[in-house]
A protein has these predicted regions:
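Rhodanese-like catalytic fold shared by cysteine-dependent sulfurtransferases
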Residues: 2-6, 17-38, 45, 54-86, ...
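Classic N-terminal secretory signal peptides
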Residues: 7-11
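Hydrophobic beta-strand scaffold positions of dinucleotide-using enzymes
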Residues: 47-49
Length: 127
């Protein structure tokens, strides 16, 4: 019995180490207020509008780039070459931004933050 205890503890330790290394890459969901705060305090981020081009043209958050959700995964995203860059993702209501964030993570992007839809945006809109 005494010989089994060290063996059991070793197995438990290795299992714990393996589990911590297998952490899945995921995106973060934040509120609109947190997104505004992040835009004010961070630098080097990209604001990604994943609505259709016609929706983007009708009005978008200043400085946002447009890559329609439907096109994510179809080809390399030339507008987003740095997969470690902070990317703030939004759409109209939050459904497409969630889908886009999930796709971006699967494509290897590591710093994705999804903050819902422009319907909740209280700041300036650029057309």
């Amino acid at each position: 019995m005494r010989n089994l205890l060290p063996l059991f503890l070793s197995a438990l330790m290795f299992t714990g180490c393996a589990a911590s290394q297998k952490q899945e890459n995921t995106y973060r969901r934040i509120s609109m207020e947190e997104a505004v705060q992040m835009m004010e305090n961070e630098s080097g981020y990209v604001i990604l509008d994943v609505r259709r081009p016609d929706e983007y043209a009708a009005g978008h958050i200043p400085g946002a780039i447009n890559v329609a959700n439907e096109t994510i995964g179809a080809a390399e995203i030339l507008e987003l070459p740095n997969k470690d860059q902070l990317i703030l993702v939004y759409c109209r209501s939050g459904r497409r931004s969630k889908e886009a964030a999930e796709k971006l993570v699967k494509l290897g992007y590591t710093n994705i933050v999804e903050f819902g839809g422009i319907l909740d945006w209280k700041g300036e809109i650029e057309a």
